[in-house]
Amino acid sequence: MSDEWMQAWQPTIDVVGRDFSGGLESTAIDTIELGAVRKFLEAVELDCPLHYDAEVAKAHGYRNVLAPISGVSQTWLDAALWRPGLGSRYPSNHPHVDVPRERVTEAPSPPTPPTTVGFATDVEIEYFEPPVVGDRLTVRGRKLVSCTPRETRVGRGAFMVWEREVINQDGARVALIRNGGYSYVPFESSDEASSPRPPRPPAP
């Protein structure tokens, strides 16, 4: 059957909506600091008192100085490359040393057919409780939101979207982060594609 490769993704489709985090969470190494917010503003020259004046922020209904939401996905969630108690991440001065990583329990994976290549496709962030100075954020969950098998110009595979939740120290939801990606088996040649596109004409 020509659609056997699509049917191979049915077990993955069947588990859409399930969490595959294994209960793992990652908490930022630091609380959000006023100095860190200042440096964040400095790079983009953002002059808004909500981000540096606590009285102004509270007068507008916020708990404290607002941290720029663009830092939610990475900066305010930084778990640190090294912490006291860990061994050196650079045990050798060799320029190509394999930097050891902290061992953590591996999260489970959904049932998927074999693929050999993949790439990120999109990132979507939905914001809720604004993060403020003094908050310490945690990211948790790894829910499979969707799985869409599709043949593209590069191969056959599926587009999958994963969702993680960001909360603050009080358990309030700060954001939902959805990451999309395409996992596939590439065509060995363009002749394998069901509907190969003709080559583009040469530029004049």
Question: Where is each model-derived feature located?
Answer:
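Hot-dog-fold acyl-thioester-processing enzymes
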Residues: 2-122, 190-204
